[in-house]
A protein has these predicted regions:
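Membrane-embedded transport module
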Residues: 1-151
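C-terminal transmembrane module of polytopic membrane proteins
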Residues: 15, 57, 133-224
Length: 224
């Protein structure tokens, strides 16, 4: 169980690397304002991600784990399936949410492709806030998804791991404190966002979770 939980922890953490990298790639390739700053990345890696990730360490073993043969001694912890799941499936979904949130603010203020995008001021700060909050929103879906590798989370009990739930509450408190505390806004380059913006971002939370549930179903069905 310890080995499996370390893999779940790693998958959860690695997935957020993609929405942290994609904004820099778009900044360089498409000459748009930087959608996510270094300080905002640190807010994720050293702040919002920590408590939910630790909650995964308390995840009970999946059903049937004792029926499986022992893993080879030379089997790596960071294997190809783990990296593919984090970097090629979960991470890209998070990156879509991150960038969608960023452009959502510009579209709200009348921007259309071809126009210059402001790289300072309230519009820009609000847009980068959406990028950060988009990562947090999808990481909530991700921490539920990472509770199992193959089995459906609905089968193991959606709210069974209380530490994961406490981690999510902690994550929401941290991101809310960063976004709505004036002196922290200045440090992290953030601006307040409203219920409509939160609703847009949290629409991606079940999308990621359900897409991962679908992937697990395919794995169970075809690679049992």
């Amino acid at each position: 169980a310890v080995y499996a939980n370390i893999k779940k922890f790693a998958t959860y953490i690695f997935a957020s690397n993609i929405p942290e990298i994609v904004p820099f790639i778009t900044f360089v390739l498409f000459k748009i304002p930087l959608p996510l700053t270094v300080m905002q990345i640190l807010a994720v890696d050293l702040g919002t991600d920590m408590a939910p990730a630790l909650g995964l360490g308390a995840e009970p073993p999946e059903h049937g784990v004792m029926d499986k043969p022992p893993r080879p001694k030379n089997k790596r912890l960071l294997d190809v399936p783990l990296l593919l799941r984090a970097y090629c499936f979960l991470g890209p979904i998070e990156a879509v949410a991150c960038m969608a949130g960023f452009f959502f603010i510009y579209f709200q203020h009348g921007w259309v492709p071809g126009m210059v995008m402001p790289d300072s001021g309230v519009i820009y700060l609000t847009a980068t806030t959406m990028s950060l909050a988009g990562i947090v929103a999808t990481q909530i879906g991700n921490v539920f998804a990472c509770r199992t590798e193959r089995e459906s989370v609905f089968k193991v009990g959606f709210f069974k791991n209380k530490l994961v739930l406490l981690g999510i509450v902690s994550e929401l408190i941290i991101i809310s404190t960063l976004i709505y505390t004036p002196f922290l806004q200045r440090i992290f380059g953030l601006a307040p966002i409203g219920l409509k913006e939160w609703g847009f971002l949290f629409a991606f939370t079940p999308v990621l979770f359900l897409m991962e549930e679908g992937r697990k179903w395919i794995v169970r069905r075809w690679w049992s």
